[in-house]
Amino acid sequence: MKNDNELSEESYREEKDTHPRMDTDVVSARILTDVLISQKVGGMIISPGSRNTPLIVAASARENLKKWIVPDERSAAFMALGMAMVKKVPFALVCTSGTALYNYAPAVAEAYYQQVPLIAISADRPSEWIDQDDSQTLVQPGALSNIVKKSFNIPVVSATDNDKQWFVERVVNEAILLSMANTPGPVHINIQFSEPLGGTVRYSEQKVRKIEVIENSSPLPRHIMDMLGAELADKRIMLTAGFLPSSEKLQKAVSNLSRLGNVTIMAETLSNLHLHQEAYSIDLPITMLEEEESTTLRPDIVISIGGALVSRMLKTYLRKVKPQEHWTLGDTKIGTDTFQALTRHYEVEPAAFISALAGSIGHHRRKRGLQESEFKKGWTNLKEKAQRRHAKYVESSGWSELKALDDIFTRIPNDRNVFLSNGTVVRYAQLSTRRLPHLTLGCRGVSGIDGTNYAALGASLAYGGRTILVTGDLSFSYAPEIISSAYMTNKLSIIVINNGGGGIFRFVKSTKHLEIREKYFCAPPHLELQRQCENAGLPYYMANEERHINEKFETFLQTGGLFEIKVNPEESAEILNNYFILK
């Protein structure tokens, strides 16, 4: 494992080309690559192949384009996803023809539902050779159509066809701009090449046209915001925040809203909103609600920002009490009716809207002399009570996932990025969050467990500081080879909760009582993590009781490596189940 001092500019490990600067003689590949650079994409993750030879040659000739080589397309796509999540700019993926493209699908789907910009580029044979029993061919245009903002198809372009060269330039500009426009997301460019594929010419820098978009992030007109502020001044308001990229503007806006005397905040760990501690307390307070409180603390209006919520309890509660109004903002798709109570969607930039709304509500509350509402007091008291019970329960409980992770989350330094895997880990983070680290990430767009390792690796490469992946043994087993990756450095540390497979199946109602649960659902992967770390030269630590975390965790934070947390699966499940019957 390399240390972070061995990384090149901006903490990236890049492949340095040693051959002379020879460019591809395929004009469409040159134009595409030059437009990527002009639009300032974050870099290109290349999966080697034959049909994408022109793109690879073009990329290798351009020293101002960052490049990473990852042969497995599935891993490459998740690595690009992690990079784009941190950098908030598009990263390009390049693969060969055939099924290679479909290996991008899981990461592209995650990017689509998490609103992360990616440029998936697939090389293809000429259209006349599709479905002609030629090798490594299938119908590629539109292959990802349900999980991208738009698909583009570029035909074979000759060196003398100016109209088609203009078409390539325009299409690639459009694709990149679309990936970042309004709600960001992935796009797919399929580009056809005829043979020969490996022809070269001496590299010569060419100027390509760069198209720009002028954005407008203004809130609604002032008179409308004033009207909304007057309408909501005495209403019981709840703001829910799912996964979000970090944003200083949104942070400030939500902070201002949270200070109002008629507002309570339900912010999930992945919201990246650094607020007062009680804002993150969600599940336990809801389970502690008495029947009478369930009605008196019912919000009149719910305003939602961010992506899909982790908390099933919050969703169930709001579906049950049915707020009079539910508003979603511009980062949510029109028609997303999570609580079955949707009344309005504002196609606005959330930070600007919330900032203006908070100011307007505050103005009208002061004008009317309104004090802190019983609604706000009730939620604040309930959350504080839940936090005390959480601390008391964790302290008195035995060694378990809950106890280990509650301890670990309090020890993670503020300057670290944290990547959470799906299943139990992200839910434990919800229960134990008292403050947020620098940035919290996870694959919650579609909530699969398959790509977490490489997404975290990509995120670590894109961040100047250090990143910690917190994952379970089943999720980690999808790509344990990550610890031997050429891009693995001590910028990424890994914590694996070894609970004998999919621990969530010991908790959810649908599976926890099934006799076949362990074999068919939990499916223990039996990882030999210590041996794998030794083979890779990666520092290894292990804890199977509380004192081991006290003894080893600080050293782990300094050296990086892998920290395995071993717990008894049945005892951990029982402790978690009992947690939710606290009163």
Language-model features: where?
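Conformationally flexible catalytic loops at phosphate/diphosphate-handling active centers
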Residues: 11-24, 62, 169, 174, ...
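Thiamine diphosphate
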Residues: 121, 128-141, 428-583
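Structural signature of the thiamine diphosphate
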Residues: 43, 87-95, 113-115, 122, ...
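Active-site diphosphate/adenylate-binding microenvironment
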Residues: 29-33, 47-51, 55, 380-464
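Glycine-rich, anion-gripping cofactor-binding loops and their flanking helix/strand elements
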Residues: 103, 241-327, 335, 435-463, ...
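A short, small-residue-rich loop immediately preceding and capping a beta-strand
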Residues: 42-45, 66-68, 86-125, 298-306, ...
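Glycine-rich, acidic loop regions that bind phosphate or pyrophosphate groups
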Residues: 122-175, 266-382, 486-487, 500, ...
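Phosphate/pyrophosphate-binding active-site segments
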Residues: 2-23, 154, 317-424, 541-583
